[in-house]
Amino acid sequence: MTKVITRFAPSPTGMLHVGNIRAALLNWLYAKKHNGQFILRFDDTDLERSKQEYKDAIEEDLKFLNINWDQTFNQLSRLSRYDEIKNLLLDKKRLYACYETPEELELKRKFQLSKGLPPIYDRASLNLTEEQAKKYIEQGRKPHYRFLVNHELINWHDMIKGEVKYDGKALSDPIVIRADGSMTYMLCSVIDDIDYDITHIIRGEDHVSNTAIQIQMFEALNTTPPTFGHLSLIINKDEKISKRVGGFEIATLRKEVGIEAMAIASFFSLLGSSAQILPYKSMEKLANQFEISSFSKSPTIYQPEDLERLNHKLLISLDFDTVKERLKEINAEYIDENFWLSVSPNLQKLRDVKDWWEICHQTPNVENLNLDKEYLKQAAELLPKGEITKDSWSIWTKEITNITGRKGKELFLPLRLALTARESGPEITGVLPLIDREEIIKRLTSA
């Protein structure tokens, strides 16, 4: 059986976002599920927009998610190989020179659209005589090159979409070499996939027409195309998610929002599939259950609050030995197991534990909370004597009810606000023993 080799090929022109991290995850998981290899390739032929800082950020995000790669390379290191294939395809008459300026091409596109026609290149340059081409060159025009798509039926079996058919007549011959001599994604990608023995490619369904063209490129180079799988798009309300829309970056989720790596990995590798989205604790366990056939053909809605809920489920499922290592990473190694167990059931983000440590160890500011001072002073007098334990809260509140007649929110909320300055949070039953007795009385009497 052929060894499975997948790849993730980001362009270092922006940050990783929830749309393309999904492709990275699924390619990695598919490779690991089948004991294969995963390759990281940087499509950096866009010299103007590609930046080292984006490449570094992409690698940082992948490492954060424990997406490790067996090989990595960038397309700029393979230009001589691309030139070799360019000459081969020119000899085969599958590439042809074009001399239209961007402005002329835009005029053609607008004209076609005004007539209700699809903006497909009209192949005007395909039939240029040598004399006409020479005239353009004398005018100072530099040619760009297009791949000649055969006008025939293109079909393949897609891992997600099933049987896919494309009419070659509906496809525009793509530009594969720009006028400045640089290569575009389309052909370089095929050459790389051939040379690195890529067997499976999982990517967004916005690449379906690219796949149809690239299948002809593989065949023009006498190579069997890889197996393709096209994921339905992730949408947020009414727009698809892409880096051009902005937001939803992985770096933002981990640095600013505070989502755990395995919450991100679990969520986006299961989103859009028939599998239940659960908080897996390791990439290996996630890979073991992974099934590419479980993914839907329909668009998938991404709601950030669902990710945050999964993050909460992951946090409360972690054993303290695992938590200890994560606490070190956020400079909160002073948190002990007792404190963690007391506050973790209500944590949405790991970093929230630092806030609760501060709440328990530093008197909160309650000046603007309009608290009932007489009630709180009365409650302070009724605080059980001796050591504060997890039983103290129920004993205390029963006594308050007996003396004041208060119940429910009227009883609990003023106490919570005076003690924590928060309307919600971990159960006060567990929080109360974390605050020194003298501090409890101070907070109640000075509110």
Curated annotation (Swiss-Prot):
Keyword Protein biosynthesis attached: yes
Entry-linked CDD domains: GluRS_core
Cellular compartments annotated: Cytoplasm
UniProt catalytic activity: tRNA(Glu) + L-glutamate + ATP = L-glutamyl-tRNA(Glu) + AMP + diphosphate
GO CC, alphabetical: cytoplasm
EC number(s) recorded for this UniProt protein: 6.1.1.17
Location of the motif 'KMSKS' region: 240-244
Binding site for ATP: 243
MF (Gene Ontology): ATP binding; glutamate-tRNA ligase activity; tRNA binding; zinc ion binding
Keywords recorded for this protein, A-Z: Aminoacyl-tRNA synthetase, ATP-binding, Cytoplasm, Ligase, Nucleotide-binding, Protein biosynthesis
InterPro entries: aa-tRNA-synth_I_cd-bd, aa-tRNA-synth_I_codon-bd_sub2, aa-tRNA-synth_I_CS, aa_tRNA-synth_I_cd-bd_sf, Glu-tRNA-ligase_bac/mito, Glu/Gln-tRNA-synth, Glu/Gln-tRNA-synth_Ib_cat-dom, GluQ/Sye
Transmembrane recorded as keyword: no
Biological process annotations from GO: glutamyl-tRNA aminoacylation
Location, primary (coarse class): cytoplasm
Coiled coil residues, start to end: none
Motif 'HIGH' region location, chain numbering: 10-20
Function: Catalyzes the attachment of glutamate to tRNA(Glu) in a two-step reaction: glutamate is first activated by ATP to form Glu-AMP and then transferred to the acceptor end of tRNA(Glu).
Record's subunit section: Monomer.
Family named by the database record: Belongs to the class-I aminoacyl-tRNA synthetase family. Glutamate--tRNA ligase type 1 subfamily.
Identification of the protein by name: Glutamate--tRNA ligase 1
Classification of source organism: Bacteria, Pseudomonadati, Pseudomonadota, Alphaproteobacteria, Rickettsiales
Gene name tied to this protein: gltX1
